[in-house]
Amino acid sequence: ANTSTEQKLNLSSAIIFCIVIYRGLRYHYQLLVLLLAAVASSAFPMSGLTYGFVGVGTMSSAMVRGICTLPVPPCSAVVLSPRGTAKSAALKGEFPALITIAADNQEVVDKADIIFIGVLPAHAEEVCRALKFSERHTVVSLVSTASMSLLHEVCSPVPHASIVRAIPLPPVAKHRGATVMTPPHAVISALFGSLGTVVPVESETVMKKMLPVSALMGQFYAQQRATQQWLQAEGVDADSAAKWTGAVFHCISYDSANANGHTFNELVEEQTPGGINEQVVREFTEGGVYDALSDTLDGILARVEGRPTPKRQKVKYSSTEEK
């Protein structure tokens, strides 16, 4: 059984690799279609792997949609737990050929090769302890607060190397996600790579330091909302204000999509001295915006690591126009 699962995992990696190439070679569409068709028609259609989701919340739903809409799904079946019945039923309606809904969580585990745990943090330990796992399984925890030591304990006898923590962001549903994960795992890294950008890190300690950045999502939207509101206050209609704001933020993010250690310094330094972009950076710096960002990330990291949040005396930004 272990050999069969290993063969499936290897073929799954090959299929996902083809999909990753497909996403990057937009001008070689016909070649990639032929390549994917050849893989799909091999002895193991769609790799033969079964994915199982214990807990079908927002993140699990996004992952299922992303997986099921890949050019060639890297699995032959997806089994969903009945928890979150409305979401499970909706996914079943969208992808009836791939998805089945299990009677309970144990049925998900029994039928799946790769199991994704997507329950609420408060319930994760209880849910996992109630399940009987096997050495053949690979377990991927999507629970932000579940430590590796806890997962190793409650998912026994799954080998430690086959237990992964991953924090994806919802755009995985559209293959535009971002995922940080530990430890590196060939098949799981390839899967998340097909759903967007994946950053595998070697240790849980490093992963914890990465997690606060994912908490900037709400702030990103709030900044756009504030920009839209400013435009509306200047007399621009709501739809035009929203469309322009969204387009600008989306456009300027492209240059940082594949960043290296020097990218952001270079992008900031490219702003024309005395220009309007440089003015925004300068005034935000003078107003303490970036210091506030750093302090907030410190606080989120403390929360992730289970430490008391640093207490700081914060002064609300204010300005008065000079006469």
PLM feature spans:
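NAD(P)-dependent Rossmann-like dehydrogenase/reductase catalytic/cofactor-binding core
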Residues: F44-L49, A161, G246, H250-K323
